[in-house]
Amino acid sequence: MDFHQTVADMAGIERSQAKTINLGLFYGMGKAKLQAELGLNTKEEAEKLFEKYHSRVPFVKDLMNNTSKDSQRNGYITTLLGRRCRFDTWEEAAYRPGKLTSPMTWDEASSKFGENNIRRAFTYKALNKLIQGSAADMTKKAMLDLYEEKIIPHIQIHDELDISIESKKHANKIIDIMQNAVSLHVPNKVDYESGENWGDIYD
C-alpha cells in the first residue's frame, strides 16, 4: 500500500502534495514552509490546502495533538519497544512574535516567566519522534535477529541495511527475519533490491 497515495485520494489532492504535507506536519511545518516546498504563490493557497487535507484526513491532526499533549503532560513519549524520548527543556507558554527565547531548564524558565506561564519545549515534534524512534526500534531489533543468525550488515543507512547475500534463498531468509522482527497488527513489508555491488543498485 502506498500511504501517500491513499492520503492523496482521501484528501482529493496530488500525491506529491500529500507526501509533502504528511512528512512536513511531523516536523511542525507551517503555511510558509508548505508554500515554499510546493512552490505555491501565496500563503492563502497553502492554508486552503491544509484545510482541505485536515477536513478529509482528520485523524492526522488528532494524532499530532494527542501525542503533543501526552508529551507535554508526561514529559516524554514512549516508542514502540518502550524507549523514552524526553522533553526536559522549557519555554514561555505564551507565543510572542519576534520574541522567541531559547529553551531553558525548569528552574531558569520558572524563575524568568513564573511556573504557571511555562510549557515543555518542542512538544510539537512529539509525533515525529514517536515515528522515527519506533522505526529505529524496528531496525535495531531486525539487526539483532539477523546477528543471531550470523548475518551481519555491512552498513545501516537510515532504515536500510546493506547485506551480502549468497543466494535468493538466503535473501528470502533475511527478508523473513526482518519482516517478523517486531509483531504488529498490520503487515510489515520489507523492500529488497540486489546487484553485483552497492553502486549498481544505489541511486
What are the functions of these language-model segments?
Residues M1-D203:
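Conserved catalytic core of nucleotide polymerization and phosphodiester-bond processing enzymes
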